[in-house]
Amino acid sequence: MKKITVIDSHTGGEPTRLVIDGFPDLGRGSMAERLQILEREHDQWRRACVLEPRGSDVLVGALLCQPQAGDACAGVIFFNNSGYLGMCGHGTIGLVRSLYHLGRIDQGVHRIETPVGTVEATLHEDLSVSVRNVPAYRYRTQVMLQLPGHGKVHGDIAWGGNWFFLISDHGQRIALDNVEALTHYTRDVRQALEAAGITGAEGGVIDHIELFADDPQADSRNFVLCPGKAYDRSPCGTGTSAKLACLAADGKLAPGQAWRQASVIGSQFSAHYEKVGEQLIPILRGSAHISAEATLLLDDSDPFVWGIGS
């Protein structure tokens, strides 16, 4: 019987499962190198952790790793039901809150190594978390897609830790009771991008689709389709970072100016950015809540020990 020890949390409604023990040893390389080892040699552990029957399509996993640098409090590898994520904003907030719950960190600034770089996270007195993300930028603007049944659609391609296609003029109603239609629409967008060979820089796969609309309680409301066909319940940290990059490129948001991003379920992140040389550094703030302490049991006699669909 194999065992995986986890802490579950949610950030603005979006769950994170932090793996604190039980995965195979991945060595002492960088987080990017360890991700490659996990994906190439031990991917069944990801599947066991986040696929049904122990997980679900919406669940994001976060493997807690020993960092390389002495000034970092943790390393982390993010994954979901379809594969791996370079960075995850809501997951980083959940990670920090979980480490505090475990008594491993206190309030203050903490450095966290990810596969796409080191981020800084601040645990505040009210236990909200600010994340100083990796640099974000807009790669292309007003990219035209021919979408079957919807005609021409224009969007921006931006990096916020993952690749996003961001659409403001889409004609969709962003509301929780319209999630099924929004999911179909954004899947069509992703398929159209793939069919047209449209990518991020250096062929990066655009696996997140983000729609925006007005919101009476925030600067914007979004709907984000994540890899694996699930939608983000939170406002999406890397997606908000990509949005900041687009707003800055259009001259619509100044450094330090606050932006409040709402999700399709109404949860919110506050955000702003700083310029460091030519780089745009997003800073996001949100809250996570602990929902479970658990031990996942992997019984070799279980036909779905490594997940349904594995």
Curated annotation (Swiss-Prot):
Keywords: Isomerase. Belongs to the proline racemase family. This is 4-hydroxyproline 2-epimerase. Catalyzes the epimerization of trans-4-hydroxy-L-proline (t4LHyp) to cis-4-hydroxy-D-proline (c4DHyp). Is likely involved in a degradation pathway that converts t4LHyp to alpha-ketoglutarate. Displays no proline racemase activity. One of its GO terms (molecular function) is 4-hydroxyproline epimerase activity. Pfam families: Pro_racemase. It is an enzyme of class 5 (isomerase). Signal peptide: none annotated. Its EC number is 5.1.1.8. It comes from the Bacteria. The active site is at residues 88, 236. It catalyses: trans-4-hydroxy-L-proline = cis-4-hydroxy-D-proline. It comes from Pseudomonas fluorescens (strain ATCC BAA-477 / NRRL B-23932 / Pf-5). Substrate binds at residues 89-90, 208, 232, 237-238. The keyword Isomerase applies.
